[in-house]
Design a protein with these regions (language model features):
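Asp-based, Mg2+/Mn2+-dependent phosphohydrolase catalytic module
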Residues: 1-4, 96, 112-215
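N-terminal helical cap/lid subdomain that shapes the substrate entry/recognition surface
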Residues: 2-101, 117
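A generic short-segment signal for beta-strand/edge and adjacent turn/coil regions
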Residues: 11, 21-23, 41, 73-76, ...
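Conserved phosphate-coupling serine/threonine residues in phosphotransfer and NTP-handling enzymes
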Residues: 13, 109-111
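A generic secondary-structure micro-motif detector
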Residues: 15, 43, 84, 106, ...
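Residue-level detector of anion-binding/catalytic polar loops
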Residues: 35, 104, 183
């Protein structure tokens, strides 16, 4: 099927940020009294907006994260991005193929607009995502796994949900795409396929993604 809109998740799909973010999140949660391993951070928090991380910690421990947690965490993440962040291998070629084929695309991310902007600048993807192509959980009332973000992106881009495909690497994102009535392509580089239940198709390499999108 040829889609009228491709909605990319950002972290882990466009920019290789999940290892950086989850390493720092695990370290910082441990530092403030909530021991967390890298593996646990990937399992429990990958794909989450910050408010969901706060809610999960409160639910599990009965304690709130300290005031200023988000600001400190984002400062550490942005500093690490400047040193380490790269685009996901092969994604530039995917985007170039979409541009050449005239297929509309955008990004729908749990991250803040600032996080998306910094990541794209450092990774050299900002040339692909200009005005009107970037949508954040900040833009809607509920983040993933609610469908609001993807539905909002589709509405702003003028495309019916049933003509959209979502590219995701987290269980929360897959659930959001399915709830929005969209096909979902699950990226298995960091998440086992069995955790991406609901995805229409899976891919392990960006080269496979080109075939799934443009076939």
């Amino acid at each position: 099927m040829r889609y009228d809109l491709v909605i990319f998740d950002n972290d882990g799909v466009l920019v290789d940020s999940e290892p950086i973010s989850n390493r720092l999140l695990a370290e910082y949660l441990t530092e403030v009294g909530h021991p967390t391993s890298y593996e646990e951070s990937i399992r429990d928090y990958m794909g989450s907006a910050m408010h969901r991380i706060h809610d999960l910690v409160l639910e599990r421990t009965g304690e709130r994260l300290p005031e200023g947690f988000d600001e400190v965490f984002h400062g550490r993440v942005f500093a690490a991005f400047e040193r380490e962040l790269k685009p996901v291998a092969g994604i530039v070629e995917v985007l170039e193929r979409l541009v050449a084929a005239g297929v509309p695309y955008c990004v729908g991310s749990s991250g803040s607009h600032e996080r998306i902007r910094v990541g794209h600048r450092v990774a050299g993807l900002d040339r692909f995502f200009g005005e009107g192509r970037v949508f954040s959980a900040e833009d809607v009332g509920r983040g993933k796994p609610a469908p609001d973000l993807f539905l909002y992106a589709a509405e702003r881009m003028g495309v019916a949900p049933g003509r959209c495909v979502v590219v995701e690497d987290s269980p929360l994102g897959v659930r959001a795409g399915v709830a929005a009535g969209m096909d979902v392509l699950g990226f298995t580089a960091m998440t086992p396929a069995e955790r991406l239940v609901g995805a229409s198709r899976m891919y392990a390499e960006p080269g496979e993604l080109v075939e799934l999108l443009l076939g």
